[in-house]
Amino acid sequence: MGSDRLIYIRTDGNSKIAAGHLVRCLSIAQNCLKTGMSVCFLLSDEESKSLLESFMTESLKENQQLSVQLLKTAKYNDLEKELPEVIELLSAGHSSYNEISSNVYLLDSYFVTKRYLSALHPVAKIAYLDDLQLFDYPVDLLINYDVIPDTARPSYEAAYQNAKKVLLGAAYTPLRRQFENKTVSIKENVSDILVTTGGSDPYHFCMEFIRKFVTVLALPGKKVQNIPTLHIVVGSLNEDKESLYALSKEYPFIRSYENVTDMAALMGTCDLAVSASGTTLYELCSLGIPTVSFTMADNQLISAKAFDNTGAIPCAGDIRKDREQVIQKIFDFIRQMSQDMDTLSADPTSDKRSASYERRLKAHQSLRNLVDGDGAMRIANELKQL
Protein backbone atom coordinates (compact mmCIF):
# COMPACT_ATOMS: atom_id res chain seq x y z
CA MET A 1 0.00 0.00 0.00
CA GLY A 2 1.05 3.59 -0.55
CA SER A 3 2.35 6.04 2.04
CA ASP A 4 -0.81 8.13 1.97
CA ARG A 5 -4.03 7.30 3.83
CA LEU A 6 -5.62 3.88 3.54
CA ILE A 7 -9.37 3.47 3.16
CA TYR A 8 -11.15 0.19 3.76
CA ILE A 9 -14.36 -0.25 1.77
CA ARG A 10 -16.73 -2.84 3.18
CA THR A 11 -19.45 -3.93 0.79
CA ASP A 12 -20.84 -6.92 -1.11
CA GLY A 13 -22.75 -7.93 -4.22
CA ASN A 14 -24.43 -11.16 -5.23
CA SER A 15 -27.48 -12.62 -6.94
CA LYS A 16 -29.68 -11.73 -3.97
CA ILE A 17 -28.65 -8.10 -3.39
CA ALA A 18 -27.44 -7.34 -6.95
CA ALA A 19 -24.31 -5.37 -7.80
CA GLY A 20 -25.29 -1.76 -7.10
CA HIS A 21 -23.26 -1.49 -3.89
CA LEU A 22 -20.13 -2.75 -5.65
CA VAL A 23 -20.53 -0.42 -8.62
CA ARG A 24 -20.89 2.77 -6.60
CA CYS A 25 -18.13 1.78 -4.18
CA LEU A 26 -15.77 1.04 -7.07
CA SER A 27 -16.43 4.51 -8.46
CA ILE A 28 -15.56 6.04 -5.08
CA ALA A 29 -12.47 3.81 -4.83
CA GLN A 30 -11.16 4.95 -8.21
CA ASN A 31 -11.46 8.56 -7.13
CA CYS A 32 -9.81 7.83 -3.79
CA LEU A 33 -6.86 6.48 -5.77
CA LYS A 34 -6.77 9.74 -7.72
CA THR A 35 -6.42 11.68 -4.46
CA GLY A 36 -3.43 9.56 -3.41
CA MET A 37 -5.24 7.24 -1.02
CA SER A 38 -4.76 3.48 -1.03
CA VAL A 39 -7.87 1.29 -1.09
CA CYS A 40 -8.64 -2.13 0.37
CA PHE A 41 -12.00 -3.76 -0.42
CA LEU A 42 -13.34 -6.04 2.31
CA LEU A 43 -15.84 -8.59 0.96
CA SER A 44 -17.83 -11.54 2.30
CA ASP A 45 -17.30 -14.16 -0.36
CA GLU A 46 -15.94 -15.23 -3.74
CA GLU A 47 -19.18 -14.25 -5.49
CA SER A 48 -18.73 -10.65 -4.38
CA LYS A 49 -15.08 -10.73 -5.43
CA SER A 50 -15.85 -12.11 -8.88
CA LEU A 51 -18.56 -9.50 -9.42
CA LEU A 52 -16.29 -6.67 -8.31
CA GLU A 53 -13.44 -7.80 -10.56
CA SER A 54 -15.83 -8.05 -13.51
CA PHE A 55 -16.31 -4.28 -13.26
CA MET A 56 -12.59 -3.53 -13.04
CA THR A 57 -10.30 -2.70 -15.94
CA GLU A 58 -7.02 -4.60 -16.29
CA SER A 59 -5.03 -1.52 -15.28
CA LEU A 60 -7.14 -1.17 -12.14
CA LYS A 61 -6.60 -4.84 -11.25
CA GLU A 62 -2.85 -4.27 -11.57
CA ASN A 63 -2.86 -1.08 -9.48
CA GLN A 64 -0.65 -1.72 -6.44
CA GLN A 65 -2.60 0.82 -4.38
CA LEU A 66 -5.81 -1.25 -4.59
CA SER A 67 -6.36 -4.63 -2.98
CA VAL A 68 -9.27 -7.00 -2.37
CA GLN A 69 -9.55 -9.09 0.80
CA LEU A 70 -12.11 -11.73 1.75
CA LEU A 71 -13.18 -11.71 5.40
CA LYS A 72 -13.06 -15.24 6.81
CA THR A 73 -15.95 -14.83 9.25
CA ALA A 74 -18.23 -12.59 7.18
CA LYS A 75 -21.79 -13.12 6.00
CA TYR A 76 -23.21 -10.41 3.77
CA ASN A 77 -26.49 -10.31 5.72
CA ASP A 78 -25.03 -10.57 9.26
CA LEU A 79 -22.35 -7.91 9.70
CA GLU A 80 -22.00 -8.27 13.47
CA LYS A 81 -20.62 -11.79 12.97
CA GLU A 82 -17.44 -10.33 11.44
CA LEU A 83 -16.78 -7.67 14.11
CA PRO A 84 -13.87 -9.40 15.93
CA GLU A 85 -12.06 -10.03 12.65
CA VAL A 86 -12.58 -6.49 11.34
CA ILE A 87 -11.52 -4.87 14.63
CA GLU A 88 -8.36 -6.98 14.68
CA LEU A 89 -7.63 -6.01 11.08
CA LEU A 90 -8.08 -2.30 11.74
CA SER A 91 -5.97 -2.45 14.91
CA ALA A 92 -3.08 -4.51 13.48
CA GLY A 93 0.28 -2.77 13.29
CA HIS A 94 -0.81 0.33 15.21
CA SER A 95 0.76 1.22 18.53
CA SER A 96 -1.24 4.32 19.40
CA TYR A 97 -4.81 5.62 19.25
CA ASN A 98 -3.82 8.33 16.78
CA GLU A 99 -2.48 5.74 14.36
CA ILE A 100 -5.61 3.63 14.71
CA SER A 101 -7.95 6.56 14.20
CA SER A 102 -6.21 7.42 10.91
CA ASN A 103 -7.98 4.42 9.36
CA VAL A 104 -10.95 5.29 7.16
CA TYR A 105 -13.73 2.72 6.88
CA LEU A 106 -16.49 3.18 4.29
CA LEU A 107 -19.48 0.89 4.69
CA ASP A 108 -22.14 0.27 2.06
CA SER A 109 -24.60 -2.38 3.23
CA TYR A 110 -28.30 -2.49 4.03
CA PHE A 111 -27.55 -4.93 6.88
CA VAL A 112 -25.82 -2.34 9.05
CA THR A 113 -26.67 -2.15 12.76
CA LYS A 114 -26.03 0.49 15.38
CA ARG A 115 -23.93 -2.00 17.37
CA TYR A 116 -21.73 -2.68 14.34
CA LEU A 117 -20.96 1.00 13.80
CA SER A 118 -20.41 1.73 17.49
CA ALA A 119 -18.00 -1.20 17.85
CA LEU A 120 -15.81 0.05 15.00
CA HIS A 121 -15.77 3.68 16.04
CA PRO A 122 -12.73 3.37 18.38
CA VAL A 123 -10.55 1.88 15.63
CA ALA A 124 -11.46 3.93 12.52
CA LYS A 125 -13.14 6.97 11.06
CA ILE A 126 -16.47 5.59 9.86
CA ALA A 127 -18.35 6.67 6.73
CA TYR A 128 -21.66 5.21 5.63
CA LEU A 129 -23.55 5.31 2.32
CA ASP A 130 -27.26 5.46 3.10
CA ASP A 131 -30.53 5.55 1.19
CA LEU A 132 -32.89 3.86 3.64
CA GLN A 133 -32.68 5.97 6.85
CA LEU A 134 -32.94 2.85 9.02
CA PHE A 135 -31.78 4.69 12.16
CA ASP A 136 -29.67 7.66 13.25
CA TYR A 137 -26.20 6.38 12.30
CA PRO A 138 -23.31 7.09 14.74
CA VAL A 139 -20.69 7.84 12.07
CA ASP A 140 -18.07 10.44 11.19
CA LEU A 141 -19.42 10.91 7.66
CA LEU A 142 -22.88 10.14 6.31
CA ILE A 143 -23.58 10.20 2.55
CA ASN A 144 -27.10 10.19 1.12
CA TYR A 145 -27.37 11.18 -2.54
CA ASP A 146 -31.15 11.12 -2.82
CA VAL A 147 -32.71 13.76 -5.03
CA ILE A 148 -33.99 15.99 -2.24
CA PRO A 149 -36.49 18.82 -2.83
CA ASP A 150 -35.76 21.94 -0.77
CA THR A 151 -38.90 21.36 1.28
CA ALA A 152 -37.68 17.91 2.35
CA ARG A 153 -34.12 18.89 3.27
CA PRO A 154 -34.87 19.80 6.94
CA SER A 155 -36.36 16.34 7.58
CA TYR A 156 -33.26 14.67 6.10
CA GLU A 157 -30.96 16.78 8.27
CA ALA A 158 -33.02 15.97 11.36
CA ALA A 159 -32.71 12.24 10.63
CA TYR A 160 -28.90 12.30 10.90
CA GLN A 161 -28.21 13.98 14.24
CA ASN A 162 -25.58 11.41 15.29
CA ALA A 163 -23.43 11.89 12.19
CA LYS A 164 -20.57 14.36 12.64
CA LYS A 165 -20.78 15.43 8.99
CA VAL A 166 -23.52 14.83 6.43
CA LEU A 167 -23.30 14.98 2.62
CA LEU A 168 -26.80 15.31 1.20
CA GLY A 169 -28.20 15.48 -2.31
CA ALA A 170 -27.65 14.37 -5.88
CA ALA A 171 -24.38 16.33 -6.14
CA TYR A 172 -22.81 13.38 -4.27
CA THR A 173 -24.03 10.68 -6.66
CA PRO A 174 -21.11 8.24 -7.20
CA LEU A 175 -21.42 7.42 -10.89
CA ARG A 176 -19.16 5.16 -12.93
CA ARG A 177 -16.02 6.82 -14.34
CA GLN A 178 -17.36 6.68 -17.89
CA PHE A 179 -19.89 9.35 -16.86
CA GLU A 180 -17.31 11.77 -15.46
CA ASN A 181 -16.84 14.97 -17.48
CA LYS A 182 -18.95 13.60 -20.35
CA THR A 183 -21.25 16.00 -22.16
CA VAL A 184 -23.81 15.58 -24.93
CA SER A 185 -25.45 18.10 -27.21
CA ILE A 186 -29.16 18.46 -27.87
CA LYS A 187 -30.07 17.84 -31.51
CA GLU A 188 -32.85 19.66 -33.35
CA ASN A 189 -34.77 16.44 -34.03
CA VAL A 190 -35.45 13.30 -32.02
CA SER A 191 -33.90 10.39 -33.90
CA ASP A 192 -32.83 7.98 -31.14
CA ILE A 193 -34.64 6.77 -28.01
CA LEU A 194 -33.08 4.65 -25.25
CA VAL A 195 -35.24 2.05 -23.47
CA THR A 196 -33.93 0.25 -20.38
CA THR A 197 -35.40 -1.74 -17.50
CA GLY A 198 -32.17 -2.68 -15.74
CA GLY A 199 -31.03 -6.27 -15.29
CA SER A 200 -34.47 -7.82 -15.65
CA ASP A 201 -37.90 -7.10 -17.10
CA PRO A 202 -40.35 -9.22 -15.07
CA TYR A 203 -43.42 -7.39 -16.38
CA HIS A 204 -42.36 -7.55 -20.05
CA PHE A 205 -42.30 -3.78 -20.43
CA CYS A 206 -39.97 -3.72 -23.43
CA MET A 207 -42.18 -6.03 -25.46
CA GLU A 208 -45.31 -4.02 -24.64
CA PHE A 209 -43.58 -0.74 -25.41
CA ILE A 210 -42.30 -1.96 -28.77
CA ARG A 211 -45.74 -3.23 -29.77
CA LYS A 212 -47.22 0.17 -28.96
CA PHE A 213 -44.37 1.95 -30.74
CA VAL A 214 -44.85 -0.07 -33.91
CA THR A 215 -48.62 0.48 -33.82
CA VAL A 216 -48.60 4.20 -33.04
CA LEU A 217 -45.42 5.63 -34.53
CA ALA A 218 -44.31 3.16 -37.18
CA LEU A 219 -47.48 3.61 -39.18
CA PRO A 220 -47.85 1.86 -42.55
CA GLY A 221 -46.55 4.10 -45.30
CA LYS A 222 -44.38 6.22 -43.03
CA LYS A 223 -40.81 6.46 -44.29
CA VAL A 224 -38.39 4.41 -42.21
CA GLN A 225 -35.91 7.28 -42.04
CA ASN A 226 -38.50 9.39 -40.20
CA ILE A 227 -39.03 6.81 -37.45
CA PRO A 228 -36.86 7.25 -34.33
CA THR A 229 -34.53 4.34 -33.64
CA LEU A 230 -35.25 2.43 -30.43
CA HIS A 231 -32.12 1.36 -28.54
CA ILE A 232 -33.24 -1.47 -26.23
CA VAL A 233 -30.86 -2.41 -23.40
CA VAL A 234 -31.45 -6.11 -22.72
CA GLY A 235 -30.61 -7.08 -19.13
CA SER A 236 -28.92 -10.40 -18.42
CA LEU A 237 -32.06 -11.65 -16.62
CA ASN A 238 -34.55 -10.46 -19.24
CA GLU A 239 -36.86 -13.37 -20.06
CA ASP A 240 -37.82 -11.82 -23.41
CA LYS A 241 -34.25 -11.70 -24.68
CA GLU A 242 -34.77 -13.91 -27.74
CA SER A 243 -38.02 -12.16 -28.71
CA LEU A 244 -36.35 -8.76 -28.51
CA TYR A 245 -33.51 -9.86 -30.77
CA ALA A 246 -36.07 -11.26 -33.21
CA LEU A 247 -37.84 -7.89 -33.31
CA SER A 248 -34.49 -6.20 -33.99
CA LYS A 249 -34.15 -8.35 -37.11
CA GLU A 250 -37.71 -7.66 -38.19
CA TYR A 251 -37.66 -3.87 -37.79
CA PRO A 252 -34.64 -1.81 -38.88
CA PHE A 253 -35.45 0.93 -36.34
CA ILE A 254 -35.11 -1.43 -33.35
CA ARG A 255 -31.66 -2.25 -31.98
CA SER A 256 -31.02 -4.50 -28.99
CA TYR A 257 -27.89 -4.45 -26.81
CA GLU A 258 -26.60 -6.80 -24.13
CA ASN A 259 -23.57 -6.55 -21.82
CA VAL A 260 -22.99 -2.90 -22.69
CA THR A 261 -19.48 -1.94 -21.54
CA ASP A 262 -19.77 1.79 -22.22
CA MET A 263 -23.30 2.78 -21.26
CA ALA A 264 -22.37 6.47 -21.24
CA ALA A 265 -21.49 6.29 -24.94
CA LEU A 266 -24.76 4.54 -25.81
CA MET A 267 -26.81 7.00 -23.77
CA GLY A 268 -24.93 9.87 -25.37
CA THR A 269 -26.21 8.90 -28.83
CA CYS A 270 -29.85 9.15 -27.71
CA ASP A 271 -32.16 12.16 -27.64
CA LEU A 272 -34.72 10.75 -25.19
CA ALA A 273 -34.79 7.91 -22.68
CA VAL A 274 -37.41 5.64 -21.15
CA SER A 275 -36.06 4.01 -18.00
CA ALA A 276 -37.09 2.06 -14.94
CA SER A 277 -36.28 4.01 -11.80
CA GLY A 278 -32.91 3.41 -10.15
CA THR A 279 -29.25 4.31 -10.61
CA THR A 280 -29.80 4.66 -14.37
CA LEU A 281 -31.80 7.84 -13.74
CA TYR A 282 -28.77 9.45 -12.11
CA GLU A 283 -26.61 8.44 -15.08
CA LEU A 284 -29.08 9.89 -17.57
CA CYS A 285 -29.29 12.99 -15.41
CA SER A 286 -25.52 13.52 -15.54
CA LEU A 287 -25.64 13.49 -19.35
CA GLY A 288 -28.74 15.67 -19.51
CA ILE A 289 -30.81 13.18 -21.53
CA PRO A 290 -34.53 14.10 -21.25
CA THR A 291 -36.06 11.05 -19.60
CA VAL A 292 -39.38 9.60 -18.45
CA SER A 293 -39.31 6.93 -15.75
CA PHE A 294 -41.59 4.18 -14.50
CA THR A 295 -41.47 1.78 -11.55
CA MET A 296 -41.78 -1.98 -11.30
CA ALA A 297 -40.50 -2.67 -7.75
CA ASP A 298 -41.13 -1.20 -4.31
CA ASN A 299 -37.52 -0.08 -3.84
CA GLN A 300 -37.84 2.15 -6.93
CA LEU A 301 -40.80 4.18 -5.66
CA ILE A 302 -38.96 6.72 -3.48
CA SER A 303 -36.34 7.55 -6.11
CA ALA A 304 -38.92 7.89 -8.89
CA LYS A 305 -41.10 10.15 -6.76
CA ALA A 306 -38.13 12.32 -5.79
CA PHE A 307 -37.09 12.89 -9.41
CA ASP A 308 -40.71 13.57 -10.33
CA ASN A 309 -41.18 16.07 -7.48
CA THR A 310 -38.18 18.11 -8.60
CA GLY A 311 -39.57 18.25 -12.13
CA ALA A 312 -36.36 16.75 -13.51
CA ILE A 313 -37.64 13.33 -14.60
CA PRO A 314 -41.41 12.74 -14.75
CA CYS A 315 -42.66 9.34 -13.58
CA ALA A 316 -45.31 7.64 -15.71
CA GLY A 317 -46.39 5.39 -12.83
CA ASP A 318 -46.06 1.79 -11.65
CA ILE A 319 -46.18 -0.83 -14.39
CA ARG A 320 -47.56 -3.37 -11.89
CA LYS A 321 -50.72 -1.37 -11.30
CA ASP A 322 -51.78 0.03 -14.67
CA ARG A 323 -49.65 -1.08 -17.59
CA GLU A 324 -51.70 0.64 -20.31
CA GLN A 325 -51.84 3.97 -18.52
CA VAL A 326 -48.10 3.94 -17.84
CA ILE A 327 -47.24 3.20 -21.46
CA GLN A 328 -49.69 5.87 -22.65
CA LYS A 329 -48.03 8.48 -20.40
CA ILE A 330 -44.65 7.50 -21.79
CA PHE A 331 -45.89 8.06 -25.32
CA ASP A 332 -47.37 11.40 -24.29
CA PHE A 333 -43.88 12.37 -23.09
CA ILE A 334 -42.30 11.26 -26.38
CA ARG A 335 -44.86 13.27 -28.34
CA GLN A 336 -44.25 16.34 -26.21
CA MET A 337 -40.51 16.10 -26.74
CA SER A 338 -40.59 15.23 -30.47
CA GLN A 339 -40.61 17.77 -33.27
CA ASP A 340 -43.07 15.71 -35.31
CA MET A 341 -45.80 16.67 -32.86
CA ASP A 342 -45.25 20.41 -33.02
CA THR A 343 -47.13 22.91 -35.14
CA LEU A 344 -44.17 24.43 -36.92
CA SER A 345 -43.89 27.68 -38.82
CA ALA A 346 -45.42 27.60 -42.28
CA ASP A 347 -42.30 29.34 -43.55
CA PRO A 348 -39.78 26.59 -44.41
CA THR A 349 -36.92 29.11 -44.32
CA SER A 350 -37.69 30.11 -40.73
CA ASP A 351 -34.83 29.51 -38.31
CA LYS A 352 -37.16 29.50 -35.34
CA ARG A 353 -36.46 26.54 -33.12
CA SER A 354 -39.26 24.07 -32.51
CA ALA A 355 -41.09 24.11 -29.21
CA SER A 356 -40.05 20.50 -28.59
CA TYR A 357 -36.37 21.40 -29.04
CA GLU A 358 -36.74 24.18 -26.48
CA ARG A 359 -38.39 21.75 -24.07
CA ARG A 360 -35.57 19.25 -24.48
CA LEU A 361 -32.93 21.95 -24.07
CA LYS A 362 -34.58 23.17 -20.87
CA ALA A 363 -34.80 19.60 -19.55
CA HIS A 364 -31.13 19.00 -20.46
CA GLN A 365 -29.98 22.01 -18.47
CA SER A 366 -32.17 21.12 -15.49
CA LEU A 367 -30.85 17.55 -15.38
CA ARG A 368 -27.21 18.61 -15.66
CA ASN A 369 -27.66 21.05 -12.78
CA LEU A 370 -28.93 18.21 -10.61
CA VAL A 371 -26.21 15.61 -11.28
CA ASP A 372 -22.92 16.63 -12.86
CA GLY A 373 -20.96 13.35 -12.66
CA ASP A 374 -18.42 14.56 -10.07
CA GLY A 375 -20.12 13.08 -7.00
CA ALA A 376 -17.61 10.26 -6.47
CA MET A 377 -14.69 12.71 -6.40
CA ARG A 378 -16.53 14.93 -3.92
CA ILE A 379 -16.99 11.90 -1.66
CA ALA A 380 -13.33 10.86 -2.08
CA ASN A 381 -12.12 14.32 -1.06
CA GLU A 382 -14.31 14.24 2.05
CA LEU A 383 -13.05 10.76 2.97
CA LYS A 384 -9.45 11.92 2.72
CA GLN A 385 -10.19 14.80 5.09
CA LEU A 386 -11.58 12.56 7.85
Provide a role label for each language-model segment:
Residues 187-270:
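Donor-nucleotide binding loops and adjacent catalytic segments primarily
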Residues 372-386:
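C-terminal alpha-helical cap of glycosyltransferases
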Residues 10-19, 24-31, 37, 44-60, ...:
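Active-site and donor-binding regions of nucleotide-sugar-utilizing enzymes
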Residues 139-203:
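A nucleotide-sugar donor-handling region in carbohydrate enzymes
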Residues 268-279:
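Acidic donor-binding loop of glycosyltransferase active sites
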Residues 357-373:
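A short, well-ordered alpha-helix in the C-terminal region of glycosyltransferases
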Residues 43, 273-275, 290-299:
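Short hydrophobic beta-strand element within catalytic cores of glycosyltransferases
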